[in-house]
């Protein structure tokens, strides 16, 4: 049976933004010899692997590790150490530094309140995107960075359109440029798995929060 598409469906497909091409244009617009600063929120070392390999050719990067959603605390600390190890071991054309945000799980629980029952990938996740990106842009603004972004879009399970929508909204509010991205494009996710094997990175089997953990491990309930 042939699928039937409405004019609205076709128009939406035609108007769908290609964030990778937008990133290409942003990089191409940089003046020769210019190395702008990027405040990059990272969710974990594996997701940051390809992103850092790619963007460190063009930017001086600070990896901002702010993830109060991660459960339990032992998992959080394991991911922090893996992130720091990867940054130390990765050869990069331009400097990559590390900054850890406060780990206060209650900040995540507050933003997720009333959405605990929702499935992964919906409004609760969008609220979590916003929580982490707003913390990132505030720090980027305070520290005088040229751009901010997140590694989250590399995951096939993360909504790149929503991430860019939130990023652009925050950029307009705080006056720090958002670096458009969909890092899973051009085999970015595939490259991240290759780098994870190459560096022996710990790859967790759930996003990080207690709700995703319960979905992945129902036998523990």
Residue ranges and their predicted role:
Residues 2, 6-50, 58-221:
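Nucleotide-activated chemistry modules centered on ATP-dependent adenylation/adenylyltransferase
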Residues 55:
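Aromatic pocket-lining residues of Rossmann-like dinucleotide-binding sites
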């Amino acid at each position: 049976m042939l699928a039937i598409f409405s004019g609205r469906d076709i128009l939406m497909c035609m108007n769908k933004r290609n964030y990778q091409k937008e990133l290409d244009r942003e990089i191409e617009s940089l003046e020769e010899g210019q190395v702008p600063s990027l405040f990059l929120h990272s969710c974990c070392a594996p997701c940051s692997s390809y992103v850092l390999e790619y963007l460190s050719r063009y930017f001086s990067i600070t990896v901002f590790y702010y993830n109060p959603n991660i459960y339990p605390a032992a998992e959080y600390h394991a991911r922090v150490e893996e992130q720091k190890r990867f940054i130390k071991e990765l050869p990069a054309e331009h400097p990559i530094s590390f900054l850890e945000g406060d780990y206060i799980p209650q900040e995540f629980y507050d933003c997720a309140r009333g959405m605990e029952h929702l499935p992964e990938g919906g409004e609760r996740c969008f609220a979590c995107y916003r929580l982490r990106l707003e913390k990132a842009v505030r720090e980027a603004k305070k520290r005088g960075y040229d751009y901010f972004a997140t590694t989250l879009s590399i995951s096939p399970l993360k909504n790149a359109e929503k991430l860019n929508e939130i990023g652009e909204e925050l950029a307009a509010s705080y006056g720090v440029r958002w670096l458009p991205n969909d890092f899973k494009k051009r085999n970015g996710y595939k490259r991240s798995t290759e780098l994870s094997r190459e560096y022996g990175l710990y790859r967790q089997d759930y996003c990080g929060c207690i709700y995703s953990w319960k979905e992945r491990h129902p036998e523990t309930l």
